[in-house]
């Protein structure tokens, strides 16, 4: 404001004073008065994805969209975000519009299902009203809507099976997001919308894939993640998991178009150890010569699966490698106490 004319400055101050009198203190302010605000984030539980997102996780007070084909890992990633928020003492809610949430699987991923607020709404309007009420409470840290495609407008549910309802869902989403955006930002809640894929008919050139629910979510979302299964993980004759790639197609809080790759193991979720090995090799913290993986003088094992198993059995080594990677990317360091408690929880849930 140094170069602005004194009369203009005085006029701005007077206008700001009138606005504060009318709408309350804090309704208008100069951005520099508060200093540079630090963008708070909730970890995704996946080191490579936290790095790709640029701020160490999904930003608080923003709308996130996760979309991809069936069985690609959308719900798994969302549940990991819920688990990470709960570990830090946060509250979480899950709007299960698909009526397909598996509490046993959620528990295995580290979600505290006893404290998880769950709703299985009958209509899209009901789902979004519940979402608004929970966000407005200011007590929820992470809220997941699974999924946008399952938010069926009331008129469609009450109508006949063959009736045409063009644009109803898009109008519903557009209206809801207009109402929700400000509330989400004030409450500092992460709202994750899971979405499916559809194909446009008659597209000859370009990408025929699109997401249901109209265009509003594309605009209002601060982060959009495209998640795909790229390979199967085999052990012997059986398939034990999926290799997954996430592309950050939109990011308002950091540079976009970054990618992350990780393992999603069946009944376990995202493999933390596999992620540490992969990122460690990429950053030259873990050395790979032939099939052998080593960290300094410590031999982790021959083959990636053996290296993963070694880190699982030696959490202190895994923590040391992880914190070196986190330091390199200026991410908050992981704590030993938390990591061991997570190990115990995982072991207990697998035994049960």
Swiss-Prot record:
Compartments where found: Cytoplasm
Family membership noted in the UniProt record: Belongs to the RecA family.
Sorted UniProt keywords: ATP-binding, Cytoplasm, DNA damage, DNA recombination, DNA repair, DNA-binding, Nucleotide-binding, SOS response
Stored SUPFAM superfamilies: P-loop containing nucleoside triphosphate hydrolases, RecA protein, C-terminal domain
Pfam families: RecA, RecA_C
GO biological process: DNA recombination; DNA repair; SOS response
Function: Can catalyze the hydrolysis of ATP in the presence of single-stranded DNA, the ATP-dependent uptake of single-stranded DNA by duplex DNA, and the ATP-dependent hybridization of homologous single-stranded DNAs. It interacts with LexA causing its activation and leading to its autocatalytic cleavage.
Binding site for ATP: 68-75
GO molecular function, one term: ATP binding
Gene3D superfamilies reported for this sequence: P-loop containing nucleotide triphosphate hydrolases
UniProt name for this protein: Protein RecA
Organism: Clostridium perfringens (strain SM101 / Type A)
Matching NCBIfam families: tigrfam_recA (TIGR02012)
SMART domains, per database record: AAA
SS bond partners: none
Name of the gene encoding the protein in the UniProt record: recA
GO CC terms of this entry: cytosol
InterPro entries named among the record's database cross-references: AAA+_ATPase (IPR003593), DNA_recomb/repair_RecA (IPR013765), DNA_recomb/repair_RecA_CS (IPR020584), P-loop_NTPase (IPR027417), RecA-like_C (IPR049261), RecA-like_N (IPR049428), RecA_ATP-bd (IPR020588), RecA_C_sf (IPR023400)
The organism's place on the tree of life at top rank: Bacteria
